[in-house]
């Protein structure tokens, strides 16, 4: 135990490179068992606390009075410079303003509204899988890249002819979750340019909706501007947030799903034989893969936790993936079991900031699994996965696989 504690002193949890190897799960298991509230001193970025147990992650995320969301909401260089979304974006607000922002777009994310997308999303998934089966050997990251863009684009009101552009720009703009893009000046410049182009695209789309409104999210953002509830810049930040939230986690979650089934082939056969397990399988995928690694909160007052003092103004990282591997809550937490019945995972968050797109995310995964079972008989890795070096996303640069038809 002393050697593990000594090793922890030399690990910077804000360094994305630490997460490029799945061995990080062992470090978080140690923290859950021996140091559930851990102080990460200033290094890559300012110092911060980490909570790793399920009970603590749930408590901190639910208590928006003690632990606020108005600062930077993820680890990254913006903690030095400040975050443009602070106090303005849905993820960076609390209380009445958060409720008001959420209400503006809630109608588009109800289960009833999402259900209308099912036939369309199923066709996108089936076409992507059929094309991959024709190639046989593919990078599965590319195979599933269109699914999240297609779904959020439909809700936003983006024409199908622009999907390719949206995929290209979102991949470039939000690829900065990768350590290589954070350290390369040219890559950072490309990401900034793509991000600017996305915001200009949003501005053009809002201009169109002012004269030709539709039943979509962009129209609702324009209506909120007209009512004085949002500035144009705030509306563009909202558009930005929905694209990011609907793209990275869903895409990498689908890739992580296939990887989990390749690691546990008996679970794949179990699901193919019994589709009644689809719902619990989706829950287990979300728990086991945990596409979103963490969120940040800021202490609004001095508070004590596990006998240690968190000072007002200090940041606290809520590590969702660690909570989802907590043996105090989950039996055999490191095992992938699609029949798991007790599964109160935190992959979609909890409390006031519970994922706005939860119904969409779960439907996407359920359709993806169903079509995967329909079309793919077996999958095998051609080479080990190349993981993203990211503190934010449990994702992949590449997963080269061979797919065989059902």
Protein language model features and the residues they cover:
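Cytochrome P450
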Residues: 1-406
